[in-house]
């Protein structure tokens, strides 16, 4: 049986907030890989990018994601670009049910502006254009998720319920496959 729920998707789709809600509803632990990275590095993501570059950030992210195999009954929110790396995808697929949270570029842009967080890859140039560009580059990897939830017109609770419903469907499918041999 799948032992973790792993959230992926672009920045601003609600992964951290919704992941926490799902963990509370399921009485599971919650981990946000970006938060965990900033704790371990004693620096913000913006500082990591500025001082060490994106490649160092991705290296740290990969090391953290490889630790998934030791976790069980966790809801894990990953960074927006984590799934792009093949090894990260492999770890995610082997150790969890991957749910992609989707939203339109306009929705993402509005949410990011409300959060007042600096997103290093989006802050270069026109944010709306950059969001569209990065989403387009990552769409193939996001499409490899086990389930996708469009968050534009749903409340966080509705999204959380949809994730749990999807996870339960997947567990039933796995159980039937095992039972039928």
Identify what each model region corresponds to.
Residues 32-81, 86-93, 118-120, 127:
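ATP-dependent small-molecule kinase phosphotransfer cores
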Residues 24-32:
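Post-Walker A helix-loop "phosphate-sensing" segment adjacent to the P-loop in P-loop NTPases
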Residues 21, 25, 97, 136-181:
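NTP-dependent small-molecule kinase module
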Residues 16:
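Walker A/P-loop
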Residues 10:
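P-loop (Walker A) phosphate-binding loop of NTP-binding proteins
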Residues 94-139:
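A glycine- and Lys/Arg-enriched "phosphate-lid" helix/loop adjacent to the NTP-binding pocket
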Residues 7:
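Hydrophobic anchor at the beta1->P-loop junction of P-loop NTPases
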Residues 13:
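ATP-binding Walker
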């Amino acid at each position: 049986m799948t032992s973790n729920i792993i959230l992926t998707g672009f920045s601003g789709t609600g992964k951290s907030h919704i992941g926490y809600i799902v963990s509370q509803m399921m009485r599971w632990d919650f981990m946000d890989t970006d938060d965990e990275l900033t704790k371990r590095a004693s620096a913000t993501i913006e500082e990591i990018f500025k001082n060490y570059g994106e490649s160092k950030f991705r290296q740290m992210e990969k090391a953290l994601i490889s630790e998934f195999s030791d976790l069980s009954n966790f809801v894990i929110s990953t960074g927006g670009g984590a799934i792009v790396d093949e090894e990260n995808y492999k770890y995610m697929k082997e150790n969890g049910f991957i749910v992609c949270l989707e939203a339109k570029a306009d929705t993402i842009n509005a949410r990011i502006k409300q959060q007042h967080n600096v997103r290093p890859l989006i802050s270069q140039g026109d944010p709306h254009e950059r969001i569209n560009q990065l989403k387009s580059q990552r769409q193939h990897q996001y499409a490899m998720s086990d389930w996708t939830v469009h968050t534009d017109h749903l409340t966080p609770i509705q999204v959380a319920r949809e994730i749990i419903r999807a996870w339960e469907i997947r567990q039933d499918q796995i159980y039937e496959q095992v039972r039928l041999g």
